[in-house]
A protein has these predicted regions:
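Matrix-facing interhelical linker segments
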Residues: 1-331
Length: 331
């Protein structure tokens, strides 16, 4: 198994684990992004509203498609990002291992743009379905077709299944409907670019600082590699880099979410921005920002740690498997 494939597997599993841990925040932040200023709710009110109308499980609506989406997204992204990273490092004349020094800013941006663009074009249909699941609700009916109500007599709401959403998109917009919001989604390629470029720079600064404390310079054989970073290093660097990325690109996240949810009749990304500014002001482009920052920062922090641990675990399994084969061949 190639190093890039191991990174892809680790990113896929690590991202899924992080998503599962923080999914209620993912769900709430998506809903907050598509609500208008008139509908704006506090986090506590949003949680209470979901539980009242959909039950506790409403906080996990769309979880299955999200886990599938993040697994595919991270797998594709890490595969291409690591391939680009290895290629760029080989151009320096170095060996592309996990302990190789960090990418330069230009290299990080290039690797991120290529990996992010490929990933976005490939996985946009998955996120269109997930967003629709998380933001749409239909009236619950029993076996006889009668409307189900709660203790207060209000109609119960249920979330549509992924299959139901797929059918609705096909009936309404055809195949092109799965690429709703692709414009802002491609612009949002900048999010992981900023995230990973910031992460690489923070790694470089941290390792350089530690070398300076040892009285060495970060060049040649004395350079520390990324393998010297602790889990806490990865957690905080991952969180900080995601904070920077999400803060800078959030208005596009709002526009993309609204286009994918199809809860607002916007004909294009530009018209969506103009309509939001006219109806809700600048604050409309930052609807749900607090929740999104909390969710994305925690998800990224957990993901960076999980990805590294899974990567190391798989590498050890491969080494052990190779050693066993050698022993068997000698017998």
């Amino acid at each position: 198994m190639s190093d890039s494939a191991i990174h892809a597997l680790a990113g896929s599993v690590g991202g899924s684990a992080a998503m599962a841990l923080t999914y209620p925040l993912v769900n709430l932040s998506t809903r907050a992004a598509v609500q208008t200023k008139k509908e704006e709710l506090t986090t506590r009110e949003a949680v209470a509203k979901v539980i009242k109308s959909e039950g506790v499980l409403g906080l996990y609506s769309g979880l299955t498609s999200s886990l599938f989406g993040i697994a595919v997204t991270n797998g594709v992204y890490y595969a291409f990002y690591e391939e680009m990273r290895s290629l760029l490092i080989r151009r320096r004349g170095n060996t592309p291992t996990s302990s190789t020094s960090a990418l330069t800013t230009t290299e990080g941006i290039l690797a991120g743009l290529i990996a992010g663009s490929i990933t976005t074009l490939t996985t946009n249909p998955i996120w269109t379905v997930q967003t629709a699941q998380a933001t749409h609700a239909t009236t619950a009916r029993n076996a006889s077709g009668a409307i189900e109500t709660d203790v207060e007599g209000n109609a119960k709401k249920v979330k549509p299944s992924a299959i139901t959403v797929v059918k609705e998109i096909l009936e309404k917009d055809g195949l092109k409907g799965f690429w709703r919001g692709i414009g802002p989604a491609l612009i949002l390629v900048l999010n992981p670019v900023i995230q990973y470029t910031t992460f690489e720079r923070l790694v470089s600064l941290l390792l350089g600082f530690r070398l300076a404390k040892q009285g060495a310079t970060p060049t040649g054989k004395t350079a520390l590699g990324r393998s010297s970073l602790s889990d806490w290093d990865l957690f905080f660097l991952g969180a900080l880099s995601k904070l920077v990325a999400t803060s800078g690109t959030y208005p596009y996240i709002v526009v993309k979410s609204r286009l994918q949810a199809a809860t607002h009749k916007y004909k294009s990304s530009i018209k969506a921005v103009l309509h939001i500014l006219e109806a809700e002001g600048v604050n409309g482009l930052y609807a749900g920002l607090g929740l999104k920052l909390l969710q994305s920062v925690l998800t990224a922090a957990f993901m960076f740690v999980a990805q590294r641990r899974i990567y190391e675990f798989v590498k050890k399994l491969i080494v052990l498997s190779a050693e066993r084969k050698k022993l068997v061949s000698k017998v």
